[in-house]
Design a protein with these regions (language model features):
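Flexible "cap/lid" subdomain of the alpha/beta-hydrolase fold that forms the substrate-access gate
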Residues: 1-8, 15-17, 23-25, 29, ...
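Catalytic histidine-centered segment of alpha/beta-hydrolase-like enzymes
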Residues: 271-283
Length: 300
């Protein structure tokens, strides 16, 4: 995986981030942020397809993969999306960039959303994969969503309930959660799956990921509420899975129009793990949007 990429560690925001990065430093930078319970390896099919147009930067988020997993606090601020976004801002400044395109999937999309709110001057355009706004998802939760996204409500339980239960057999938990969400038709490559499972066997990673979700249900919502009625100004493109819970449970575009001033989007015929299932489609849509090429937007 990532044959044309370098691997490095960067000291940012008081922690060490593991980063995969292409060496075409004269190209416009784009950051790809992974989701739960994965690592930057989820981009191994998409990232190489972007190299003709971008310098591609793929970090492991704090708490995930080979990045540091700092101890948390009672308010879960250590794993708030604001703190995680500040990691990415510090990373990009250290790499010499003050403006970049931004792509996020799942938890990484939530970090990207917060980054664009707090540091909008740095984000040229943003593509978010298979999420609706977090606060609005909680506010509009019904039994169908709670059933499909059961892990949202399991991982937020008081320490150490989810940590101990997952830690008894992290491989089985990972496979049951992700293979089910992928419709039992997994497109995870052997190398990527090994990286995911190896990373998730770490007790610190399990705890950090629980803290990520605890933050989402508490301090992240508080930060959203502090934003008031101001809408995100960054040009935003939403792609969500026709075979996923977001499509079934929410009016995705309506929720995003409540939060963003310049938003387009569409559903695609895939599952939640679209970057690994239909990488060519996702890569082309990223290129088209972020390079301001004309594209036809349709959504159901």
């Amino acid at each position: 995986m990532f044959e044309k990429f370098n691997e490095t560690y960067l000291e940012v925001n008081g922690i060490r981030l593991f980063v995969r990065k292409s060496d075409n430093v004269n190209a416009p930078p784009i950051v790809l942020l992974h989701g739960y319970p994965q690592t930057s390896a989820m981009w191994h099919k998409v990232a190489p397809m972007l190299l003709d147009d971008f310098e591609v930067i793929c970090p492991d988020l704090r708490g995930y993969g080979r990045s540091d997993k700092p101890s948390s606090d009672e308010l879960h601020e250590t794993y708030s999306k604001r703190t995680m976004a500040n990691d990415i801002v510090a990373m990009m400044r250290q790499l010499g960039h003050d403006k970049f395109d931004l792509v996020g999937h799942d938890r990484g999309a939530r970090v990207a959303h917060r980054l664009a709110i707090d540091h909008g001057e740095m984000v040229k355009s943003m593509v978010l994969l298979d999420i609706a706004p977090g606060r609005e998802m909680y506010e509009n939760t019904r039994s169908d969503f709670a059933h499909a996204y059961w892990h949202w409500f399991f991982l937020t339980q008081k320490y150490p309930i989810p940590e101990q239960m997952i830690g008894l057999d992290p491989d089985s938990y990972w496979k049951l959660k992700c293979f089910n969400q992928a419709g039992h038709n997994s497109s995870f490559s052997e190398d990527a799956l090994k990286e995911y499972l190896d990373a998730f066997r770490d007790d610190a990673a399990i705890h950090a990921s629980c803290e990520d979700y605890r933050a989402a249900a508490t301090i992240d919502i508080a930060h959203d509420n502090e934003d008031g009625t101001d809408k995100l100004a960054t040009p935003l493109y939403i792609i969500w899975a026709k075979k996923g819970a977001i499509e079934k449970c929410f009016d995705v575009m309506d929720l995003w129009r409540q939060r963003a001033a310049k938003v387009t989007g569409e559903s695609v015929d895939t599952t939640h793990y679209m970057a690994e299932e239909i990488p060519l489609v996702i890569a082309q849509k990223i290129i088209n949007f972020c390079t301001n090429q004309v594209m036809e937007i349709t959504h159901d």
